[in-house]
Design a protein with these regions (language model features):
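Membrane-embedded hydrophobic alpha-helical segments
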Residues: 1-13
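Long, hydrophobic alpha-helical segments that serve as membrane-spanning/inserting helices
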Residues: 16-194
Length: 194
């Protein structure tokens, strides 16, 4: 009986930690990573997924988008450079997220963040050494580095879609607010170009 109670308490504690991490993720996705996700989806060629599509999608459509996002393709290599550099600019966010995942004992998230931070450091070392060169141009023939790039950027797309699915199920009005904020930012960026 005691073991059953302990297991129930552990499950409840884990659920509380998941909820706390979801709040942290909400803040991060809505504020500090907004530009990154807008850029990443903007550079995406296949699957053809836009923030507008996500906003108007049903749960089953979001799940279909997520499946299609297992294999991503980008418009061009040059379109990847600003997305990669935005990852570098947001390193502090990934570091914070890794620390919170450690605090909450979410090992898979910690592993993902370590991989991402290592990638960011690869880019930073390159840019410190060759500030005038495009990172993507220099590594386009390096198979290992290109795999890292597609993994990091693709994982970003998939993470956003996973989060959209989670919110669609648990807090659809919050998903709508986040996507409204994203579209507002996108529109401001478009207006500033003209």
């Amino acid at each position: 009986m005691q073991r059953v109670v302990e297991n129930l308490l552990k499950k409840k504690e884990k659920d509380v930690r998941k909820k706390q991490l979801r709040y942290i993720k909400s803040h991060i996705f809505r504020s500090e990573l907004r530009k990154l996700f807008i850029m990443n989806f903007g550079a995406l060629k296949k699957p053809s997924i836009s923030l507008e599509n996500i906003k108007n999608a049903s749960l089953s459509q979001l799940q279909k988008m997520r499946l299609e996002a297992e294999d991503v393709e980008y418009k061009s290599l040059v379109d990847l450079e600003p997305v990669i550099l935005e990852y570098v600019k947001t390193q502090h966010v990934w570091q914070l997220f890794m620390e919170k995942a450690m605090d909450f004992h979410f090992e898979s998230i910690v592993e993902d963040m370590i991989y991402l931070i290592h990638f960011i450091n690869d880019v930073k070392i390159f840019k410190d050494t060759y500030p005038e060169k495009l990172f993507i141009e220099e590594v386009k023939n390096n198979e290992l580095m290109m795999r890292k790039i597609y993994k990091v950027l693709g994982d970003g797309i998939r993470s956003f879609l996973n989060y959209a699915i989670e919110l669609k199920e648990k807090a659809p009005e919050f998903l709508e607010e986040i996507l409204y904020d994203y579209q507002f930012t996108q529109n401001l960026q478009k207006e500033s170009r003209y």
